[in-house]
């Protein structure tokens, strides 16, 4: 076998391979012998069919099968010999395939880029430093109390935190529009479910009152015929209810699990949950900055085939989220996923190089700790730990996450890291 490799463009390569005729014909003869042992031909016993009849009957299909095997085996021999970092599948083109002549074919393929990390010391990372305060815990307890709240009817005027029951009729230019009318409609005030100005127009009114509200539909409103239109809503306020929060007692906290018997137990449990959530959020925030820095300092080309594979993964995930199937996923435009797919391939290559260049191995103790932290969120943590330990796929996922975290740590060790005090809300609700 002889071959030549050339670069066509970017990460694309083409190899031309010549396989001696004797090699091909020998493979054909061996396959014909194998076929002859089991071939059934009228007039002959199994295994006793003459070679020339086997050749005539099965020769074409055998040569086709042998061709596929020879293309694959000789191409991958070149890949192994030349230590090619192959990306995706090759495209074969046969240039010569005739009996008694050398087989000549080409394979066009892509390779992964050679990555030489640079600029790690130029990456800037801002690391939030957060202390969970008693006030933070109080806020979480308020959320729990609101989830268990009841509602009591009141004769007082409606406020922005109340629940109201209304009839309304909406009109534009004096005409009632489709979907603009409802009776006994329950509205939780302050949640922004209605168009701007609607809830504000109810505040200050009491049950039994009838009044009008003048509003303007937003330009981005979903109904084309209402975008930007001035509207009038005739309101009948039938009921106003105020939220009644349960008292913070041992009886109340007992609803939240067998380990919460007192208010102090609940506060401790909430603190542990908040610490776990905070740790995950801080890890994600720092990792995001590290990855952004790696990409900014290391511009690399990526194989189109790898991007296409990632697009298909993202398509499938999108379809699953919305209850679709493979056929529906295939209809989603690739443009929706192309940038994200390219970024994911780039990040994967850069982190792989960090792992290789720093000779990182999975920290098994760290993996064990991660599983225990996941399990601590369940009522039977020991069972969760055992379930993970017996599930090879889950364990591999955990090890991959840990190795990726170790890679991020390796970059952080060289990056410019500054610490900045932040609140729990700053980290958990950055858009708030």
Swiss-Prot record:
A single GO molecular-function term is: ribosome binding
Keyword Transmembrane in record: no
Question: What catalytic activity is recorded?
Answer: [protein]-peptidylproline (omega=180) = [protein]-peptidylproline (omega=0)
Principal EC category: isomerase
Span of domain PPIase FKBP-type: 161-246
Kindly give the InterPro entries that the UniProt entry links to this protein.
PPIase_dom_sf (IPR046357), PPIase_FKBP_dom (IPR001179), Trig_fac (IPR005215), Trigger_fac_C (IPR008880), Trigger_fac_C_sf (IPR037041), Trigger_fac_ribosome-bd_bac (IPR008881), Trigger_fac_ribosome-bd_sf (IPR036611), Trigger_fact/SurA_dom_sf (IPR027304)
Entry EC number(s):
5.2.1.8
> Its GO CC terms?
cytoplasm
Please state the span of the N-terminal signal peptide per the UniProt entry.
none
Q: Which UniProt keywords apply?
A: Cell cycle, Cell division, Chaperone, Cytoplasm, Isomerase, Rotamase
One Pfam assignment: Trigger_N
Q: What biological-process GO terms show up in the record?
A: 'de novo' cotranslational protein folding; cell division; chaperone-mediated protein folding; protein transport; protein unfolding
Where is this chain primarily localised? cytoplasm
Give the location in the cell: Cytoplasm
UniProt xrefs under SUPFAM superfamilies? FKBP-like, Triger factor/SurA peptide-binding domain-like, Trigger factor ribosome-binding domain
Family (UniProt): Belongs to the FKBP-type PPIase family. Tig subfamily.
Q: Known HAMAP family for this protein?
A: Trigger_factor_Tig
NCBIfam families from the entry?
A: tig
Instruction: State the protein's purpose.
Output: Involved in protein export. Acts as a chaperone by maintaining the newly synthesized protein in an open conformation. Functions as a peptidyl-prolyl cis-trans isomerase.
The record's note on its domains = Consists of 3 domains; the N-terminus binds the ribosome, the middle domain has PPIase activity, while the C-terminus has intrinsic chaperone activity on its own.
Write the protein's name: Trigger factor
- Originating gene: tig
């Amino acid at each position: 076998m002889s071959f030549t490799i050339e670069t066509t463009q970017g990460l694309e390569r083409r190899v031309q391979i010549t396989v001696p005729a004797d090699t091909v014909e020998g493979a054909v003869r061996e396959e014909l012998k194998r076929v002859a042992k089991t071939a059934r031909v009228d007039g002959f016993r199994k295994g006793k069919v003459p070679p020339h009849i086997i050749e005539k009957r099965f020769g074409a299909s055998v040569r086709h099968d042998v061709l596929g095997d020879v293309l694959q085996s000789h191409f991958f021999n070149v890949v192994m010999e030349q230590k090619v970092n192959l990306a995706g599948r090759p495209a074969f083109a046969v240039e010569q395939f005739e009996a008694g002549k050398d087989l000549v074919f080409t394979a066009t393929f892509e390779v992964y880029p050679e990555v030489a990390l640079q600029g790690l010391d130029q990456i800037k990372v801002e690391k939030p430093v957060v202390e969970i305060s008693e006030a933070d815990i109080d806020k979480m307890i308020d959320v729990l109390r609101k989830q268990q709240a009841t509602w009591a009817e009141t004769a007082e005027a409606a406020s922005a935190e109340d629940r109201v029951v209304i009839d309304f009729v909406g009109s534009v230019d004096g005409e009632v529009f489709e979907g603009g009318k409802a009776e006994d409609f329950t509205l939780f005030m302050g949640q922004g479910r209605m168009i701007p100005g609607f809830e504000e127009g109810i505040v200050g009114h009491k049950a039994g009152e009838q009044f009008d509200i003048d509003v303007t539909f937003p330009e981005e409103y979903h109904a084309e015929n209402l975008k930007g239109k001035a509207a009038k809503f005739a309101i009948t306020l039938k009921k106003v209810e105020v939220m009644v929060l349960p008292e913070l007692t041992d009886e109340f906290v007992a609803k939240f699990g067998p380990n919460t018997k007192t208010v102090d137990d609940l506060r401790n449990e909430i603190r542990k949950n908040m610490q776990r959530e905070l740790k995950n959020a801080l890890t994600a925030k720092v990792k995001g900055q590290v990855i952004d820095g790696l990409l900014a300092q290391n511009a690399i080309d990526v194989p189109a085939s790898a991007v296409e594979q990632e697009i298909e993964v993202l398509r499938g995930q999108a379809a699953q989220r919305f209850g679709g199937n493979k056929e529906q996923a295939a209809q989603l435009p690739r443009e929706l996923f192309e940038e994200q797919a390219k970024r994911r391939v780039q990040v994967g290559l850069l982190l792989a190089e960090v792992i290789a260049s720093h000779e990182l191995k999975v920290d098994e103790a760290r993996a064990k700790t991660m599983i225990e932290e996941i399990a601590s969120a369940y009522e039977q943590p020991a069972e969760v730990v055992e379930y993970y330990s017996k599930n090879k796929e889950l364990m591999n996922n955990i090890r991959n996450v840990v190795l990726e975290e170790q890679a991020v740590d390796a970059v952080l060790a060289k990056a410019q890291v500054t610490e900045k005090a932040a609140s729990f809300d700053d980290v958990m609700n950055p858009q708030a």
